[in-house]
């Protein structure tokens, strides 16, 4: 049943979005419905902008941007809904791989000036740092889902950092253990 759901979700963006995000606690069921719709459109046009994924429908595009700008929408609630679906799917597998890594998302357009430092002192690259834990089924390497993700902006002056970035790895491991509970004994961490 779970394997069928994963396979189906890979082929139908709307099914995937509904299975991953329909339990998001956004304070109003209309927001959750909008999240599912926006996620489905973006998944259907993977790697494309909201404008392109809206396929010429201005109402869909404006709805997506209003959703993103809504102060009542919590990125943490969205991430948590996805992680909880990952935990639910993980129950079907006897052995899992938790792939953990940090990467950067580099931006060059106008808004990039407000983002964090990515490179060395003289480097002008700006963007986000993202630390993720991706859960895979161990024998087929099929993606189960995203178990944890945290993103932050690095300050221009390293002395202004709130914490050492190595702490992101420890926090990810602790969150993974908390979410997986007794299933953690089935998980092989790959860092």
Residue ranges and their predicted role:
Residues 2-191:
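Conserved, well-structured functional cores that handle cations and Mg-NTP chemistry
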């Amino acid at each position: 049943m779970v394997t069928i759901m994963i396979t189906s979700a890979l082929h139908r963006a709307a099914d995937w979005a509904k299975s991953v995000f329909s339990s998001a606690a956004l304070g109003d069921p209309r927001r959750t419905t909008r999240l599912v719709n926006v996620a489905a459109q973006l998944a259907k046009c993977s790697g494309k902008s909201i404008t392109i994924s809206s396929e010429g429908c201005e109402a869909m595009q404006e709805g997506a941007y209003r959703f993103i700008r809504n102060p009542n929408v919590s990125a943490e609630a969205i991430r948590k809904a996805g992680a909880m679906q990952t935990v639910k799917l993980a129950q079907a597998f006897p052995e899992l791989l938790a792939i953990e890594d940090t990467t950067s998302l580099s931006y060059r357009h106008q808004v990039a000036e407000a983002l964090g430092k990515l490179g060395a002192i003289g480097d002008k690259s700006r963007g986000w740092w993202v630390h993720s834990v991706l859960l895979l089924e161990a024998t087929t390497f099929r993606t189960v889902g995203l178990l944890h993700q945290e993103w932050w902006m690095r300050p221009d002056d390293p002395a202004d950092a709130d914490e050492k970035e190595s702490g992101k790895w420890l926090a990810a491991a602790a969150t993974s253990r908390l979410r997986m509970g007794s299933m953690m004994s089935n998980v092989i961490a790959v860092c």
